[in-house]
Every structure is written in structure tokens, then in C-alpha cells.
Design a protein with these regions (language model features):
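Start-transfer (signal-anchor) and selected internal transmembrane alpha helices
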Residues: 1, 15-82
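Perimembrane helix-loop-helix junctions
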Residues: 257-279
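Transmembrane-helix motifs of polytopic, lipid-linked glycan transferases
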Residues: 156-177, 215
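Multi-pass, polyprenyl lipid-linked donor-dependent membrane glycosyltransferases
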Residues: 94-97, 154, 160, 188-220, ...
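Membrane-interface alpha helices of multi-pass inner-membrane proteins
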Residues: 236-251, 262-263, 279
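Transmembrane and membrane-interface helices of multi-pass
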Residues: 63, 77-80, 159, 172-176, ...
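Membrane-proximal lumenal/periplasmic loop motifs of glycosylation machinery
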Residues: 84-93, 104-162, 202
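Specific aromatic-rich, kink-prone transmembrane helix
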Residues: 104, 168, 208-228, 240, ...
Length: 280
């Protein structure tokens, strides 16, 4: 498999001074983004107030409730079905190939990414946690007579997990005062933008981490929104600890994300941590 770099794109490759053209395009996009932020700063409040008075599809509730999150997840999954069928059984990348090779091959293991042989069953170049998960589903496929079935089962579960995480994040925006038309638009985008289900059907560490990180980020925002009060709930605290652990286990940058964000929370909301530790 070959991944083409930016300079190999035909459009830019045929242009003189293509790097200059590329940087000018980036500068133009940056300027447009800054202009958009400036205009939103001037007129954003009025726009939000206007949208807040509108209630498109009154029968559809996009609020932070179990019923709304489940309903949104089901709708998203139904609209993802064509892409799930197209991607059957699943897509994988080279990292996953290496991880599956580790899972099914006893030591010593040749690791193509580093071009060497290791006298070890598993190599932590990619998270071992992910390797065990991916390998277990392919192994399960072997048990029932088809590796494709094992991969497809994993892809379906990851799609459901991703759809639930995205739906929850859209519904959570209600707590932040985001108008319903915007929440509805974001949910529709999640449901119909093809790269999202395509990504969710990929058996790779990045796809798994993405869904975990969405939930971790929502939990982080909830702590900030409540000024630390959310940490007083044992259920919320347990969810936050589990999500933090999954962030660390599913992708190595998750360690740094947790350390930096956790340090901020530990310092800013230390009184809630102390109270929680005493209660435990």
C-alpha cells in the first residue's frame, strides 16, 4: 500500500512553484477562518438568540438524555448502513497488519515497521491493548470459520460505539446552550458525511481512540462547565477514570493528553478531588 504525499497530487504537481501555491491556499483559509471568527464575534449572539427561538422538527428531541442519545445513535447507524455494507467486512491499515501478525505469531517476531526481529511476543510500538482486542476478534472469526465474520463483528461494534459517542456529544451541546438547529445540523452531518462511517469501519488504533477521546473530551468539558462539581458524583468520577484509562491504553498520545489535562483539573479543582478521596 502506498500513501501519496501532498506533492504527488496531480493538480499541485503540474503547477510551477507548487509549494508557494499550497502555502498561499493555507494562508487564504486561515484568513477566511479569522474573518469568520471575527464576524461571529460581532453577530454571533444575535444569531444564537434567533436560532434559539426556532424549534425545527418539534417531535425530535436532541437533549442530553438517555432516550435522546439512544434515538440519535439508532438514526445515525441506520444512515450509515450503506457504508457499512460497502466496507464489509472492515478496512484495516498497515499498523493493524503488524498487530495481527504479533497476535498470531509466537516469538521471535519479525516487525516489518522497524525491519528487525524481536525476541518478544508483543511489541509496544503500537498499543498492546489494541493488539489484543483486534487479534481476539480475528481469533473469534477463526473459531466460527471465517476471519471476515470476526472483523465484521468488531467493525459493527466500533460503528455503534462511534455513533453513540458522536450522538452523545451532539446531545450534550444542549447543556452548553447551543440552539437546537445547530445541534440538529451537526447530527445530520455526522449521519450523512461518508468519511465518518468509513473511519468507524476501520480496524485500527486511531479509529478506536477517536471514539474514546470524544467521550473523554465531553467529560472534561462537563468538569469545566460545572466548575468541578461533577467530580462529586461517584458515577461520573468512575466514568472519567475509565475513559482516562482507555485514552492511555488505546493510543500512546493519550498518555500526554491525560497527563496535561489531568494536571490542570487536579490543580484547578483540587478541593473536589480531596473531598472525593475522603468520601471514598
Amino acid at each position: 500500500m502506498h500513501y501519496a504525499g501532498l506533492e504527488t497530487y496531480p493538480l499541485l504537481a503540474s503547477m510551477p512553484y507548487r509549494k508557494l501555491v499550497f502555502y498561499l491556499l493555507i494562508a487564504a483559509l486561515f484568513f477566511a477562518a479569522c474573518l469568520g471568527i471575527y464576524q461571529f464575534g460581532k453577530h454571533g449572539k444575535k444569531l444564537i438568540d434567533t436560532l434559539g427561538r426556532k424549534n425545527p422538527l418539534p417531535a425530535v428531541s436532541i437533549t442530553f438524555s438517555a432516550k435522546s442519545i439512544v434515538a440519535s445513535t439508532v438514526v445515525v447507524l441506520v444512515l450509515w448502513l450503506p457504508w457499512i455494507a460497502v466496507e464489509y467486512p472492515a478496512s484495516i491499515d498497515w499498523d493493524t497488519y503488524n498487530q495481527l501478525y504479533q497476535f498470531f505469531t509466537p516469538a521471535p517476531t519479525y516487525y516489518s515497521t522497524m525491519g528487525t526481529v524481536f525476541d518478544a511476543e508483543y511489541i509496544d510500538h503500537h498499543p498492546v491493548f489494541d493488539t489484543l482486542i483486534f487479534g481476539s476478534f480475528v481469533w473469534l472469526g477463526n473459531v466460527v470459520g471465517s476471519q471476515n465474520m470476526g472483523m465484521f463483528l468488531y467493525a459493527l461494534l466500533q460503528c455503534a460505539f462511534t455513533a453513540a459517542a458522536l450522538s452523545l456529544s451532539c446531545c450534550y451541546l444542549d447543556k452548553l446552550g447551543v440552539p437546537k438547529p445547530i445541534r440538529l445540523s451537526l447530527l445530520v452531518f455526522v449521519a450523512i458525511f461518508p468519511p465518518i462511517p468509513n473511519w468507524a469501519m476501520c480496524m485500527c488504533k486511531d479509529s478506536l481512540f477517536s471514539a474514546v477521546f470524544i467521550l473523554y473530551f465531553v467529560a472534561f468539558i462537563e468538569i469545566v462547565r460545572t466548575k468541578g462539581a461533577a467530580l462529586g458524583s461517584k458515577r461520573f468520577l468512575a466514568c472519567y477514570v475509565i475513559l482516562s484509562g482507555l485514552c492511555i491504553l488505546t493510543k500512546k498520545p493519550g498518555v500526554y493528553i491525560f497527563i496535561l489535562s489531568g494536571f490542570v483539573l487536579l490543580v484547578v479543582y483540587r478541593r473536589f478531588w480531596k473531598r472525593t478521596l475522603v468520601a471514598l
